[in-house]
């Protein structure tokens, strides 16, 4: 409800009159009452709402993904005319979007599955927008979407046509998977600095403030520095009294499931999903901590040196995560015939969305230089960072393992990097085993 309300206010602020409808009459009245003088026109039946719009009608749905979206579409259909456009701005599973696009197209309606990132504030002030569907239908809503989107530092709006049917929602799904990876990498960096150097919350905030001035400059680093010093009403640091169970809404899981369907090694992001799952086993972890032993932890040595190693490890880990995510976008583009523009996708992530970061411009530059590049790690800039920072990543992972600090995503970054650069892997033995017990055959070198 908040996302829908804020998007309506955003659209209204760009000079449009917006018809609003909610199943709950009270919520519809509330939105209008809380925003006096705004060009928000309330309607209390679906028929009146639809009939209030100019044709071709442009209807933005912001409802809970799943059955709710189908119910909303079915309630609209009796009053729609051929050529009308429904935009689904929810966190919808892309296969559902492909199905709805096909079904509505057959009836003469247009359907645009649109990823919207930036949370409640982004919806109001300017989100990153990822529309997918019929190109001609997108052209009819592009003026509105362009006006409400976030604007990057170079003045470019953070919206672009992504591709046919489910492409927009797929890109939003991968965006969310990358977000999981970013957040887990940052959490592991925090754990290392706290466990290895015993940094105070003030020192952590100062460290992240410095990091936010350089390569790691991003929304997530920015909010993390603020989180470290936030206190509750009792004067305690809030982060220290929050239960260590991370919830999830399932979009990270969808990204990992899709990687398995496509045969893409999305190991870092998948580990970040599993890290949330194991965090939720709080009772088991507390019990296990009293039974299972670990190593005696040793201090991490020189403070400034270790902080810099963790910073480098975090940046290279982030690069590996994005390399995996964009590799999966390439595989999906081929599988679903979307013809994705990876440089443009990186561009619209530069503002408005949760993963917005300075380094996204480097991804755009890499694809501009070599559009068909197989993996971002092979681009000159990222290859140079890998050359310069891999030792720090290895040192940090080795320290963590020797001192019993779990670093699933840092570990996944090293494993993926070494596997990807290996001309020969021990998979020949696996294939021999498969042939031995199942006559699966093999290829000779």
Curated annotation (Swiss-Prot):
Disulfide bonds: none annotated. Substrate binds at residues 91, 117-119, 175-176, 180, 249, 276, 434, 440. Gene3D superfamilies: 6-Phosphogluconate Dehydrogenase, domain 3, N-(1-d-carboxylethyl)-l-norvaline Dehydrogenase, domain 2, NAD(P)-binding Rossmann-like Domain. One of its GO terms (molecular function) is NADP binding. Keywords: Gluconate utilization, NADP, Oxidoreductase, Pentose shunt. The active site is at 172 (proton acceptor), 179 (proton donor). InterPro entries: 6-PGluconate_DH-like_C_sf, 6PGD_dom2, 6PGDH_C, 6PGDH_Gnd/GntZ, 6PGDH_NADP-bd, 6PGdom_BS, NAD(P)-bd_dom_sf, Pgluconate_DH. One of its GO terms (biological process) is pentose-phosphate shunt. It comes from the Bacteria. Belongs to the 6-phosphogluconate dehydrogenase family. This is 6-phosphogluconate dehydrogenase, decarboxylating. It comes from Pseudescherichia vulneris. The gene is gnd.
């Amino acid at each position: 409800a908040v996302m829908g309300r804020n998007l309506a206010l955003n659209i209204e602020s760009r000079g449009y009159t917006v018809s609003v409808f909610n199943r709950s009459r009270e919520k519809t009245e509330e939105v209008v009452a809380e925003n006096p003088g705004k060009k928000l026109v309330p309607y209390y039946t679906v028929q009146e709402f639809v009939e209030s719009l100019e044709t071709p009608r442009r209807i933005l749905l912001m409802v809970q993904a799943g059955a709710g979206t189908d119910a909303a579409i079915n309630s609209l259909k009796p009053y729609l005319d051929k050529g009308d456009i429904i935009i689904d701005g929810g966190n919808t599973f892309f296969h559902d979007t492909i199905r709805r696009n096909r079904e509505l197209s057959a009836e003469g309606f247009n359907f645009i599955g649109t990823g919207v990132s930036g949370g409640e504030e982004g919806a109001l002030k300017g989100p990153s927008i990822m529309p997918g569907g019929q190109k001609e239908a997108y052209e009819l809503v592009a003026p509105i979407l362009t006006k409400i989107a976030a604007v990057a530092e170079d003045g470019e709006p953070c919206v672009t046509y992504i591709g046919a049917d489910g492409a927009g929602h797929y890109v939003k799904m991968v965006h969310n998977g990358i977000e999981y990876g970013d957040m887990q990498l940052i959490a592991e960096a925090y754990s290392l600095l706290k466990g290895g150097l015993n940094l105070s919350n003030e020192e952590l905030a100062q460290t992240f403030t410095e990091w936010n001035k350089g390569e790691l400059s991003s929304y997530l680093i920015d909010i993390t520095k603020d989180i470290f010093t936030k206190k509750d009403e009792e004067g305690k640091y809030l982060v220290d009294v929050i239960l260590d169970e991370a919830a999830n809404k399932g979009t990270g899981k969808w990204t990992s499931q899709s990687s398995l369907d496509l045969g893409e090694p999305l190991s870092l992001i998948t580990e970040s999903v599993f890290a949330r799952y194991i965090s939720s086993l709080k009772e088991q972890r507390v019990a296990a901590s009293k039974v299972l032993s670990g190593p005696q932890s040793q201090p991490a040595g020189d403070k400034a040196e270790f902080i810099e190693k963790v910073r480098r490890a975090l940046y290279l880990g982030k690069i590996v995560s994005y390399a995996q995510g964009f590799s999966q976008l390439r595989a999906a583009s081929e599988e679903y015939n979307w013809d994705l523009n990876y440089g443009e996708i990186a561009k619209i992530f530069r503002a408005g969305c949760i993963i917005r970061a300075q380094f996204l411009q480097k991804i755009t530059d890499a694809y501009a230089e070599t559009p068909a590049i197989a993996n971002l790690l092979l681009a000159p800039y990222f290859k140079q960072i890998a050359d310069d920072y891999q030792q720090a990543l290895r040192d940090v992972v080795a320290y963590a393992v020797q001192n019993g600090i779990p670093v699933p995503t840092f570990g996944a970054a090293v494993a993926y990097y070494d596997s990807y650069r290996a001309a020969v892997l021990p998979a020949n033995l696996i294939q021999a085993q498969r042939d031995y017990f199942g006559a699966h055959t093999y290829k000779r070198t």
